């Protein structure tokens, strides 16, 4: 434990290989460790040019003062090494000075931060790796001292600096070296026996000792020394914190650890325990090291929320015992995580975590566990070891769930498209990253990273040519092409669509190619489902097809059956209506979540014209159809088919390009352009009932007749001459058989006889038990009786 008064250290403790075990360090096994003065160490390296040596602290509990140091490791070389290093030193010296004066206690008498920066720039050593394939060096400020715990605390802010800085060397700083038992390769030595590269001096006039971070030669006039606030107060000035276990419980743990009787135990209080030596009566050997007794007494001190029992005199002659004072450290960790606003619960009871700068949904508990491990860089250093234990992580996980009370609304940003590295605003063309994206809580992501500024102009031109073949930009196909662009670009928007869309055409007309391109762009937001969502009844029972639609932005249903077959089920009109509602009811197996938010553009890929079990105005307002009339083939035979407008050669390499996501960013760029063209400021897609054969009867009927009402009473006398009768209210109506005869004059009975009968069955009314009538008036009859008035 470092004290407020710094003591010099001229003995360098070295490891002779990486990963020396603790027992070899403690036993001073000369095969693995050795101690040198600076001159001895320099001579040893000169005599053993192939040696591997790493300097480290021998006993951090006893002594942990070090020089401020940085380790940089980057692949590749710098074009302007001098200027890059100069900029790096400027950034780092300011960072160290800011941290020392703003977050720490400056023990030395210096109060001028600018002078400290200037002095650091004049008093540093820097090594250089002989490896020409990488940029690697150690930077040591030999006039700037601190403690290891202070460097560990500094690591959090250094991580932030490395993430936010644009300097390549700053980004390449290895922050993992700031830990307990750190080691740094000594200048002039190899990493291992296989590696031929070493770190060499860059300035021969700088003494060898100034290339060592554990060498301490402190001078109050010329050197700087700072420690963290908590460490500066420890041990004598640190008060007993409220969150610690009760003091008498701590004394009980101390007594148990000592084993022997503590004669002055009653004299020890929370105010004096750090300055009162323990008077131990050794009835049995020491419980810590098993020696018969000790000449010097044991003492207590506080460090990192722990009581440490150490022996005065030679502290290495007895083991140091550590007793935690935290009442519930795991709960404290949970509270720190909650305060960072990185975990929430949705109104569906699903947990969301902010992990690697994106919101992720926890379908199981794996993401919460990953979050806990990921937070180790954002928690205090004494918490990180606790996170390594799986049992501790499970406790923290349950704590987090129990501490979340209020649910939050999610996915309320229809114009936001989430990627793995941020959120893209498709309306304003802005890409949000990091904390800027955090406010947009989107639980479903495309599953890949957005590449900003990527040049895809050539690929876009190639892809646009393919799309122009699938849906030609001709005068005859203008409306079809426009609807095609509107539908595809609507997939980007996370809101309920007013229509279901049919892609209708023969085989090899580009429907599947369109689907694959959409899947490449939308990826995890794309769902391919079966025809059951259209033909089977939708209820609250298990329906994984519907449950998987939750928050998806594209749902593709391929290959509807041939409706001309008697065994084929027709499309249920009720299902169409439900699929255009904001909430679709259906649950996964073994799940109670039945309400699924419907943000999808639902596209039906079919070779057969759709047929519905019933047709009304509501269903006609919900259907749009795109015809695909370009046939792609490489056959040498001529293709004669009235259903094709164009015959184009088949590109056999197209599938492999799409599957490799070759067109991903190009198609995304095209979709964004179409979105701005059609859907800003509002989403706009109109139905096309006139393209659906099943709707033609209904559309024609509506152009022939109108429902009769009280406004037609004044025409009763004239209408009765045309075969009309009156109902109980005096409103003109037609007898059922006369209505059927008049309607049949406008239709081919062989084609539409069943539709006529179905319409009559649905709308007929009864005057009495025997007489049936239809409460409609033919528009042509109204025109006939009004003609004389107009003349």
From Swiss-Prot:
Annotated GO biological processes are: DNA replication
Name the catalytic site residues: 174
Identify the EC number(s): 3.6.4.-
Lineage of the source organism? Viruses, Varidnaviria, Bamfordvirae, Nucleocytoviricota, Pokkesviricetes
Tell whether Zinc is among the UniProt keywords: no
**Full protein name:** Primase D5
Domain SF3 helicase, by residue range, is 479-641
Answer yes or no on keyword NADP.
no
Q: Which domain of life is it from?
A: Viruses
Could you give the subunit structure recorded for this chain?
Interacts with A20.
Report residues binding ATP: 505-512
Provide a Gene Ontology MF annotation, just one. Answer: hydrolase activity
One matching Pfam family is: D5_N
Which residue stretches belong to region Primase? Answer: 346-471
Sorted UniProt keywords = ATP-binding, DNA replication, DNA-binding, Helicase, Hydrolase, Nucleotide-binding
Q: Which family does it belong to?
A: Belongs to the poxviridae D5 family.
* Role of this protein: Primase which may have roles in initiation of DNA replication or lagging-strand synthesis.
């Amino acid at each position: 434990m470092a004290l407020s008064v710094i003591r010099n250290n001229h003995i360098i403790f070295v490891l002779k290989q990486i990963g020396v075990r603790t027992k070899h360090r403690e036993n001073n096994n000369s095969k693995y460790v050795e101690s040198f003065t600076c001159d001895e160490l320099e001579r040893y390296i000169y005599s053993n040019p192939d040696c591997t040596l790493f300097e480290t602290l021998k006993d951090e509990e006893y002594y942990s003062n070090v020089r401020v140091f940085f380790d940089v490791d980057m692949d590749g070389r710098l074009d302007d090494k001098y200027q890059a290093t100069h900029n790096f030193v400027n950034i780092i010296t300011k960072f160290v000075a800011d941290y020392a004066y703003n977050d720490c206690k400056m023990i030395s008498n210096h109060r001028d931060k600018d002078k400290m920066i200037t002095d650091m720039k004049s008093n540093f050593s820097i090594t250089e790796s002989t490896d020409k394939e990488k940029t690697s060096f150690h930077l040591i400020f030999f006039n700037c001292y601190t403690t290891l715990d202070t460097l560990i605390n500094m690591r959090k802010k250094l991580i932030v600096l490395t993430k936010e800085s644009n300097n390549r060397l700053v980004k390449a700083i290895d922050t993992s070296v700031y830990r307990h038992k750190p080691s740094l390769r000594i200048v002039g030595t190899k990493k291992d026996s296989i590696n031929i590269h070493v770190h060499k001096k860059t300035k021969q006039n700088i003494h060898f000792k100034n290339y060592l971070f554990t060498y301490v030669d402190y001078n109050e006039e010329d050197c700087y020394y700072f420690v963290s606030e908590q460490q500066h107060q420890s041990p004598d000035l640190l008060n007993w914190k409220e969150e610690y276990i009760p003091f008498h419980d701590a004394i009980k743990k101390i007594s148990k650890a000592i084993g022997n009787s503590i004669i002055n135990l009653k004299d020890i209080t929370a105010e004096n325990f750090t300055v009162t030596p323990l008077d131990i009566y050794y009835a049995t050997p020491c419980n810590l090291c098993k020696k018969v007794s000790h000449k010097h007494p044991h003492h207590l001190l506080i460090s990192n929320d722990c009581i440490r029992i150490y022996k005065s005199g030679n502290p290495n002659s007895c083991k140091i015992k550590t007793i935690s004072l935290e009442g519930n450290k795991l709960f404290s960790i949970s509270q720190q995580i909650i305060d960072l606003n990185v975990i929430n619960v949705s109104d569906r009871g699903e947990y969301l975590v902010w992990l690697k700068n994106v919101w992720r949904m926890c379908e199981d508990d794996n993401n919460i566990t990953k979050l806990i491990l990921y937070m180790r860089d954002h928690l205090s250093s004494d918490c990180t070891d606790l996170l390594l234990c799986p049992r501790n992580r499970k406790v923290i996980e349950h704590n987090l769930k129990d501490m979340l009370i209020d649910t939050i609304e999610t996915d309320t940003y229809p114009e936001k498209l989430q990627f793995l590295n941020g959120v893209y605003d498709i309306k304003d063309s802005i890409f949000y990253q990091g904390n800027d994206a955090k406010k947009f809580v989107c639980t479903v992501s495309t599953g890949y990273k957005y590449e900003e500024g990527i040049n895809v102009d050539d690929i876009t031109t190639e892809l646009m040519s393919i799309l122009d073949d699938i849906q030609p930009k001709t005068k005859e196909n203008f409306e079809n092409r426009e609807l095609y662009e509107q539908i595809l670009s609507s997939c980007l928007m996370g809101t309920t669509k007013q229509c279901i869309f049919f892609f209708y055409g023969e085989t090899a007309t580009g429907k599947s190619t369109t689907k694959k391109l959409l899947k490449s762009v939308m990826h995890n937001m794309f769902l391919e489902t079966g025809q059951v969502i259209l033909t089977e009844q939708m209820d609250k029972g298990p329906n994984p097809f519907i449950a998987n639609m939750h928050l998806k932005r594209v749902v593709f249903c391929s290959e509807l059956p041939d409706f001309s077959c008697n065994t084929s089920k027709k499309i249920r009109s009720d299902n169409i209506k439900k699929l255009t509602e904001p909430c679709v009811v259906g649950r996964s197996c073994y799940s109670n979540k039945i309400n699924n938010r419907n943000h999808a553009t639902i596209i039906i890929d079919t070779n057969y014209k759709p047929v519905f079990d019933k047709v009304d105005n509501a269903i006609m307002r919900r259907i749009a159809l795109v015809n695909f009339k370009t046939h792609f083939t490489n056959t040498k035979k001529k293709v004669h088919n009235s259903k094709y407008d164009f015959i184009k050669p088949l590109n056999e390499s197209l599938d492999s390009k799409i599957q490799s996501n070759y067109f991903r960013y190009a198609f995304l760029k095209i979709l964004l352009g179409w979105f701005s063209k059609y859907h800003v400021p509002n989403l706009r897609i109109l139905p096309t009932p006139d393209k659906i054969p099943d709707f033609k009867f209904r559309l024609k009927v509506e152009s022939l007749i109108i429902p009769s009402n009280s406004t037609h009473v004044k025409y009763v006398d004239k209408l009765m001459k045309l075969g009309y009768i009156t109902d109980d209210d005096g409103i003109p109506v037609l007898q059922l058989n006369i209505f059927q005869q008049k309607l049949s004059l406008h239709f081919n009975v062989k084609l539409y006889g069943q539709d006529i009968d179905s319409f009559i069955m649905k709308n007929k009314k009864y005057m009495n038990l025997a007489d049936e009538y239809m409460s409609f008036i033919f528009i042509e009859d109204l025109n006939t009786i009004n003609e004389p008035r107009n003349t």
